[in-house]
């Protein structure tokens, strides 16, 4: 059994220490070691986007990131999007627009949307579709998801005014 590596990172605003094997994916550690199971395992090869998180301001699929690479980094998972028991406007918009069904892809879409709206608070439909191109949904199709992102952007802009 390989020696475990000690890693320190900030997850959802909280300093977190964990031990991991050098070959463990960040997804495996988030779910199985830290207990953040909101990040879903879909394809486990980076193609579906279900496990999308924000790592140092960029969206990544942690199924393709080694956990040891998280040393000293900041990450946001789906659990870090809401403010306590109050849903984030993105989450609320996904509910109101029925932009989810089975829920496997939803955390990845919401996290990717958060990163998009942090970078571009008023994206065009084309920009939304481009940004979310690496997130796949087999249930709802994409129109409701795109509408949810547009509505969330409008709500968030109104909150800043």
Residue positions per predicted region:
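Signature of N-terminal electron-transfer/Fe-S-associated modules in redox systems
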Residues: 1-161
């Amino acid at each position: 059994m390989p020696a475990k590596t000690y890693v320190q990172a900030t997850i959802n605003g909280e300093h977190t220490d964990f031990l991991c094997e050098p070959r463990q994916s960040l997804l495996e550690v988030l779910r199985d070691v830290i207990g953040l199971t909101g990040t879903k395992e879909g394809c486990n090869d980076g193609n579906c986007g279900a496990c999308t998180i924000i790592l140092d301001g960029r969206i990544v699929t942690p199924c393709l990131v080694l956990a040891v690479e998280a040393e000293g980094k900041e990450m946001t998972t789906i659990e870090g999007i809401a403010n306590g028991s109050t849903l984030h406007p993105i989450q609320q918009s996904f509910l109101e627009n029925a932009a989810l069904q089975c829920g496997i892809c939803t955390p990845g879409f919401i996290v990717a949307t958060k990163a998009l709206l942090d970078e571009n608070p008023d994206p065009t439909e084309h920009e939304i579709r481009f940004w979310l191109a690496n997130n796949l949904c087999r249930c709802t199709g994409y129109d409701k998801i795109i509408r949810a992102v547009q509505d969330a952007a409008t709500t968030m802009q109104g909150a800043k005014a």
